[in-house]
């Protein structure tokens, strides 16, 4: 990855935010590559979606090298643990649907309010278990999120091929889950 970054970064017209998602890319940024990326002013941070707290802790261990370099986490189920460990925040799918929940969780973790973190994290887990587990495939996360956003009137649930939106039985289950969650998550 270092050779790739050495070649790519000088050609970019905009700053680069690294995205570590080995489940999809089949590669992961090595620690030395991340440390060297911190020295490159055009690389401005990293989002980690590896689902590994061990990997994230190793990345966070590099922050003394460049404390202003943002490290974000992708899986919302890890947001509170990541922020408590020193991450700067997250880019979480469920925040598109319930933004206040994720902001409150971030703020509670940042403040070290562990009782509030536990309470809010349990709600995030209900979102995850309820919306992202409908269907059989790994696409269930995006289908669940887009379907819930569509049912909430925020966007259409159409997806790029080969993915397809949920059919009526899955949409009905999604509606049921939304009806259960929404009163818990909205003021």
Listing of model-derived features with the role each one plays in the protein:
Residues 1, 26, 141:
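Conserved donor sugar-nucleotide recognition element shared by glycan-biosynthetic enzymes
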Residues 7-14, 22-128:
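Catalytic alpha/beta core domains of metabolic enzymes, predominantly
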Residues 87, 98-187:
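C-terminal alpha-helical cap/extension of soluble enzyme domains
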């Amino acid at each position: 990855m270092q050779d790739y970054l050495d070649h790519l970064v000088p050609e970019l017209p905009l700053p680069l935010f690294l995205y570590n998602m080995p489940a999809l890319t089949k590669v992961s940024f090595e620690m030395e590559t991340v440390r060297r990326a911190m020295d490159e002013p055009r690389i401005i941070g990293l989002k980690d979606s590896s689902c590994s707290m061990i990997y994230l802790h190793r990345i966070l261990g590099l922050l003394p090298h460049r404390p202003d370099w943002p490290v974000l986490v992708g899986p919302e189920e890890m947001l509170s643990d990541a922020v408590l460990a020193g991450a700067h925040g997250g880019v979480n799918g469920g925040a598109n649907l319930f933004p206040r929940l994720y902001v409150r969780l971030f703020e509670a973790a940042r403040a070290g309010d562990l009782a509030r973190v536990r309470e809010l994290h349990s709600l995030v887990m209900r979102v995850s278990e309820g919306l992202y587990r409908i269907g059989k495939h790994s696409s269930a996360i995006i289908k669940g999120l887009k379907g819930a956003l569509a049912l909430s009137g925020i966007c259409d649930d159409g997806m790029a091929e080969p993915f397809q939106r949920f059919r009526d039985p899955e949409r009905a289950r999604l509606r049921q889950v939304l009806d259960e969650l929404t009163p818990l998550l909205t003021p």
